[in-house]
Amino acid sequence: MNQSIIAASWGPHGRGAEISYTIADSPFGRMLVAVTPLGICALSVHQSDEWQESELRRDFREARITRDDDAARPAANAVLRYLRGETAGCEVPLDVSGTAFQLSVWRELCAIPEGATRSYGEIAARIGRPSAARAVGHANGSNPVSILIPCHRAIGANGDLTGYRWGLEIKKKLLAFEQSRADRATLNSPIQPG
């Protein structure tokens, strides 16, 4: 995935944002996709629709939020096609808010190839802040569009899976899904002369 991350078109807590959302079944649970006119601003996976709606309203408490399946469906369908293995990637614009540091972490997460992982320390070093592994972890936890900005690819220094907002079981499933896709891509690639 090579995401186009747009710095938020709205103010703190969604001030000035017009957000539409939909909820659909995904291979990883119920999925909420929220969009502005510029892109996806929130994506969550959970078993409870009510909990996801409550989180969206809490995170964007100053936005005008409407459940509008028609407006959000194209973005949700793009994500679902990717999660079902029907497309090679999910390149949809993102309209997200974060500090300059968070945005640099999120861009680096998007650069990690499917099927690969990086430690928080490796991510910190790649963005030029080698002593900021803990801050990278906090930026990971602040990611509003989990899966699309693949924070599940970040792991502990010892290789252990670490916390994930939607639970370690979903993190394991996402990593297995991506590894399977990466393995298939390798099997289907032409043999290079050597």
Predicted regions and their residues:
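Basic nucleic-acid-binding alpha-helical/helix-turn surface characteristic of O6-alkylguanine DNA
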Residues: M1-S131, F177-G194
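Short glycine/serine-rich loop segments
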Residues: S131-K173
